[in-house]
A protein has these predicted regions:
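Short linear clamp-binding motif
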Residues: 1-9
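Active-site neighborhood of HAD-like aspartate-dependent phosphohydrolases
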Residues: 8-58, 159
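Conserved Lys-Pro-Asp/Glu-containing loop-to-beta segment of HAD-superfamily phosphomonoesterases
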Residues: 114-147
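Acidic, Mg2+-coordinating phosphoryl-transfer loop and its flanking beta/alpha structural elements
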Residues: 134-169
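Short amphipathic alpha-helix with an adjacent loop that forms part of the alpha/beta core around
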Residues: 124-130, 166-173
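A short, structured active-site edge motif that brings together acidic residues
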Residues: 83-96, 100, 104-124
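Short, structured coil segments at secondary-structure junctions
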Residues: 78, 110, 149-151
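Short, acidic loop-to-helix structural element flanking the phosphoryl-transfer center
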Residues: 46, 55-84, 92-97
Length: 173
């Protein structure tokens, strides 16, 4: 299968794969918000304690800041009617509703293109019913590897410039 960036002809918007974009640490800064809510670095806090503190922080999810470069990335992909594909937390009953509120406040992604799933289910969005591949932009390499293994095109998000270059190489302008 030829990749879009290998084609010499001009690629139309309709020929491009659908974009599925993660939220946490791609668009919004979960770690910054979590560190503040927990009162210490999230990764060092006791697992049960940290999630209890997040659950008890009113407006935690919808109050997250943009991740550095997140607005720039969203502005670029917004032209292509992206989907949001984000894992909800099974440890915080507020995460689904809060993520939806964050998206409504900060983006124009319609509810029908927002998929809040268990982390391990992201790979189910790798290909469409017709077999065409989708793109996943995600900071977690395990998600990228699983998505690629199912026939998708994973972009491991480590910084916005790199992600935008990879999208442009795939034909997005």
């Amino acid at each position: 299968m030829k990749l879009l960036y290998e084609l010499d002809e001009k690629v139309s918007k309709d020929d491009l794969p659908d974009i599925y974009c993660d939220m946490d640490m791609v668009l919004c800064d979960f770690m910054k918000g979590a560190d503040k809510a927990v009162g210490e670095p999230f990764i060092y806090a006791d697992r049960e304690t940290r999630w209890k503190k997040i659950s008890n922080t009113k407006g935690f999810w919808e109050g997250l800041d943009w991740y550095p470069g997140g607005k720039r990335l969203y502005s670029f992909i917004a032209k292509y009617d992206p989907h949001i594909l984000s894992a909800y937390s099974t440890k915080d009953a507020n995460s689904r509703r809060g993520k939806l509120k964050w998206l409504a406040k900060n983006t124009k992604v319609p509810r029908g293109k927002t998929h809040l799933v268990l982390r391990e289910d992201k790979q189910k969005y790798a290909v469409n019913r017709d077999g065409s591949s989708n793109i996943l932009i995600d900071d977690y390499i395990k998600n990228i590897n699983e998505f690629n293994a199912k026939g998708g095109i994973g972009i491991h998000h480590t910084d916005t410039g790199k992600t935008l270059r990879e999208l442009k190489n795939l034909g997005f302008k």
